[in-house]
Amino acid sequence: MTHTETTVKLFFAAVCASAIAVTARAQPAPYHHYRTLNTQHFRITVPDGLEREGRVAGAAAEHAYEQLARELATPRGVIDLVVTDDADYSNGYATTVPSNRIVVFATPPVDAGSLRLNEDWLGIVITHELTHIFHLDRTRGVWSLAQHVFGRAPALFPNSYGPSWLTEGIAVYYESRLTDGGRLKDSESRMIARAAALEHRLPALNALSLGSPVFPGGISAYGYGSLFVDYLARTRGDSSIRRFIDAQSATVVPWAIDRDARNGFGIGFGAAYDAFRDSIQRSVGTLTPPLPGWRELTTHGYFAVDPRFTSDSTLVYASADGRSTAAEYALSLDGTRHRIGRRNALGPSVPYLGGLLFAQPDRVSPSEVRSDLYVERDGVQRRLTHGLRLVQPDARRDGTIVAVQLAPTRSSLLVLDPTRREYRLLRSAAADETWSEPRWSPDGSAIAVSHRTHGGMFSLEVIDVASGVATVLDRGAFIITSPSWSPDGK
């Protein structure tokens, strides 16, 4: 056997092995009846009942394709786009294996703060995932020849060898540049970076990963990655991103991306990131308390969210510390805390008839994740609803509950009486309309709620429960969220 034959056989074995080791992803439920819609560049597949959402997604995808085609080399062939409603969270993913395909969950982002700044959230998700296709499908040189022989094996896409901060950073950059929203237009990533700079803890480039155990976890790949890519585009020119992607797609050693960076941006990633990090460090001053008399009650770091007072001296909050599962904690004002119970996701827990009321997602089948209401008393959790798709509950003193009900591309308001097992629709929603974060007034006569309508207009409204009449307190093309009442009902 010649050396060349041995090399070819070893390479073929590596390709076959990589095809087996593809990362598993959530798949749409196989038992739905599906319909297919066709556009110029997409084959759109939707389950029965989501035909409207499929048409909207098709139009958004063609618009995103047209815009991205002005920036990057176009991908090969027709792209499969699946719109599904199998999970009660807003998400999507893209893959180039075995063909170019995108899956988008139709649930609107009522919980994801960084995705709420938009005129069309479905357009943002599709633009983000389609950028992955434009980026990762790009294959030239020896890689193109290898795919011609072996097919679309995972190991034969050179751009897929890049780190997650690069892949997600490029996608967030284009989602923000080519739409009216996007995470670069939101303040969250910049706040995280500036907070780290204030403590002189800006992460190293090799620490930016979807699997990072350090705050902010996998968000670092999106946040820092997009800020860095945006910095490169501003300092090296918009066209430098295409030059880099083209260089990366033909490189023989795909993980040696610093050479491709010099070809595309005129500077290696290491040197560029040092300059980027220095620019953030120079933009911040000194760390000062946000308010006079400010005192930090938690020091464990990572995520501590959704605090709710249960008495004058105690509050509860949801936490994920990076070392254990998400959980609810009770915290006294002297800093003493204890763990109440685990949670499947972070979210508010509110006082409810001697216990705590909360919503959490769980699998109802191998392919479906649904959110329902639970109550916890004395360490025992009991499920209150089944299949109602409820999030963000709040409870009145008599036990009446208001919660957000999720549906494809919209969310509504429900009022529930669990003792009678009755519920009524307080506010319905049209497509691309959401009601979120309802809060009872102290006297239980009204509900404050955030309302988003089509086109990205937000309003803060107070609904009189008896009459159903709403008073609009504020309205505008900016995010209005997290309403709360003062003890005197204001």
Describe each PLM feature range.
Residues D306-T314, P348-G355, Q392-T400, E437-A446, ...:
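Blade-terminus and WD-like Trp-Asp/Gly-His loop motifs, strongest in beta-propeller folds
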Residues L184, H300-A304, A318-E328, G341-L346, ...:
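A flexible loop/linker signature enriched in serine peptidases of the S9 family
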Residues Q27-N38, P216-I219, F244-L353, A359-D362, ...:
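Beta/coil-rich, acidic/histidine-enriched accessory regions frequently appended to metallopeptidases
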Residues G293-T298, T336-G341, V380-T385, E422-S428, ...:
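A short beta-strand motif characteristic of beta-propeller blades
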Residues A26-P163, G211-V214:
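Juxtacatalytic substrate-recognition/specificity segment
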Residues A21-T23:
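N-terminal signal peptide c-region/cleavage motif recognized by signal peptidases
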Residues S332-G335, E376-V380, D417-R421, D464-G468:
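Short loop/turn segments that connect beta-strands within beta-propeller blades
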Residues P28-P30, P98-S99, S114-V125, I133, ...:
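Acidic/His/Gly-enriched intrinsically disordered linker/tail segments
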